[in-house]
Amino acid sequence: MAKKSMIVKAAREPKFKVRGYTRCQICGRPHSVIRDFGICRVCFRKMANEGLIPGVRKSSW
């Protein structure tokens, strides 16, 4: 779980546009965020396994 202070800091508009970064909407994790869904890989995997993301299924070949 991300620190509350960092989540609040990331929510503010940065002074320069390039300083902005994505955070997971669920847990606040700053790394490995899947932009299409707005969540990190950990939350994505958990939600996909629970069937909460429509159209996503585990691949097998």
From Swiss-Prot:
Cofactor: Zn(2+)
Cellular component, GO annotation: cytoplasm; small ribosomal subunit
Keyword Zinc found: yes
GO terms, molecular function: rRNA binding; structural constituent of ribosome; zinc ion binding
Keyword Nucleotidyltransferase among UniProt keywords: no
GO BP field: translation
Record note on cofactor: Binds 1 zinc ion per subunit.
PROSITE patterns tied to this protein: RIBOSOMAL_S14
Residue numbers binding Zn(2+): C24, C27, C40, C43
Keywords of this entry: Metal-binding, Ribonucleoprotein, Ribosomal protein, RNA-binding, rRNA-binding, Zinc
A family per Pfam: Ribosomal_S14
NCBIfam families hit by this protein: PRK08061.1
PANTHER family named in the record: 30S RIBOSOMAL PROTEIN S14, SMALL RIBOSOMAL SUBUNIT PROTEIN US14M
Functional note: Binds 16S rRNA, required for the assembly of 30S particles and may also be responsible for determining the conformation of the 16S rRNA at the A site.
Subunit and interaction comment: Part of the 30S ribosomal subunit. Contacts proteins S3 and S10.
Protein family per UniProt: Belongs to the universal ribosomal protein uS14 family. Zinc-binding uS14 subfamily.
Name of the protein in its database record: Small ribosomal subunit protein uS14
